[in-house]
UniProtKB/Swiss-Prot annotation:
Gene Ontology biological process terms in this record: translation
Subunit structure: Part of the ribosomal stalk of the 50S ribosomal subunit. Interacts with L10 and the large rRNA to form the base of the stalk. L10 forms an elongated spine to which L12 dimers bind in a sequential fashion forming a multimeric L10(L12)X complex.
Gene3D superfamilies given in the database record: Ribosomal protein L11, C-terminal domain (1.10.10.250), Ribosomal protein L11/L12, N-terminal domain (3.30.1550.10)
Disulfide linkage: none
Name listed for the protein in its UniProt record: Large ribosomal subunit protein uL11
Source organism, top-level taxon: Bacteria
Gene coding for it: rplK
């Protein structure tokens, strides 16, 4: 049995249970002649149990016969950091100038555990450092060990 020929990949960030044919989903899928309604239904069914509106990075694989498959990744680190710091937006200034909130090292470790499947490391300490770096770039101060 041969595998289907891959036509391309589409990377989108889609809110959980919020896929609609409107931009950016509709135009991205329409260009590759994918059934937009079928994708939206499948995606919304797959994310039904999640908290509505969580941003989910999604990789859509489009095949030559216009069929598709998709892989949902974990939400961005920035989503978790904003949630733990209880802020709505990160700093627009450089990390030394404006601190908009604080997260603990334990928070960063907890986020790293959640993000491990999508990070390019298998070491929890290295993953924690990646998350701490994301926090610093958002204007969050990391307190604790």
């Amino acid at each position: 049995m041969s595998q289907k020929a891959i036509k391309g990949y589409i990377n989108l960030i889609i809110p959980a249970a919020g896929a609609t044919p409107a931009p950016p989903i509709g135009p991205a899928l329409g260009q590759r002649k994918v059934n937009i309604a079928a994708f939206c239904k499948d995606f919304n069914d797959a994310t039904q149990g999640m908290e509505k509106g969580i941003p989910l990075p999604t990789v859509i694989t489009v095949y030559e016969d216009s069929s598709f498959s998709f892989k949902i990744k974990t939400p961005p680190a920035s989503y978790f950091l904003k949630k733990y710091a209880k802020i709505t937006k990160g700093s627009s200034a450089t990390k030394k100038e404006a601190v908009v909130g604080k997260v603990t090292m334990d928070d960063c470790r907890e986020i790293a555990k959640l993000k491990m499947p999508d990070l390019n490391t298998k070491n929890i300490e290295a993953a924690t450092k990646i998350i701490c770096g994301s926090a610093a770039s958002m204007g969050l101060e990391v307190v604790g060990n």
